[in-house]
Amino acid sequence: MKTENQSAPPDILPVCRSKEEAKQYYDRISKVYDFLAGAFERKYAEIALQRLSIERGEIVIEIGFGTGHCLKQMAESVGEEGKIYGVDISSGMLEVARSRLKKAGLLERVELYCGDAAVLPYDDSMFDAAFMSFTLELFDTPEIPAVLEEVKRVLKPGGRVGITAMSRENGDSRMLRIYEWAHKKWPVFTDCRPIYLERSLVDAGYGIRNREKLKLSGLPVEIVIALKKTGV
């Protein structure tokens, strides 16, 4: 049962499909996802990865890894001394990502898990960095704080998180209104919806290191690098 979040901004649309529906949808499109949406999203994911500045030997988690393009880049960045962990709700996406990593000879550096990011199967303070690209906005509004808390739990003190998301901040463009109309009409197909990314991270107790505002086909996008405060 969904709970009401009294502090949630009223202009954030709800997610009107279940997680099981999301899983089935992404399983179905996993082999063609790169053709359908991957090329549009990849540019912004790569910018966020550059800002996150993953270093050799680090332990990093990606939530919502999709077809594995970013996992591959991160595995190359951490080298043999590091380790990448990936979580995705779709077993179909996991198989596509696994195939990509195997083909690149990087599978030994990556551990993949099919499950819900709201409950991560990892120890406290395990990761140097975390990454999400067009994933946080797939969670319903009351669940976003819980996901960010769970990410914070598994980050080391001073660890960083890089997130790319569709943005509702200062957003009232015609393209945004059309997209939100499509989200209401086809909630499974158009399941991303704009959120307040920086505000959500601040509310969850993160420190903001960097924020950029960009456009994706006229739709506002935020890239934020945030830090888990020491002593938390």
Task: Place the predicted regions along the sequence by residue.
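Short alpha-helix
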Residues: 189-205
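A short glycine-rich, Lys/Arg-flanked "PGG" loop and its adjoining helix->strand segment in the class I
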Residues: 145-157
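Conserved alpha-helix/loop element of class I SAM-dependent methyltransferases that forms part
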Residues: 39-56
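A short acidic, Gly/Pro-enriched loop at the edge of an enzyme's catalytic core
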Residues: 118-130
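Core SAM-dependent methyltransferase catalytic element
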Residues: 205-206, 210-232
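Conserved beta-strand signature within the Rossmann-like core of class I S-adenosyl-L-methionine
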Residues: 158-165
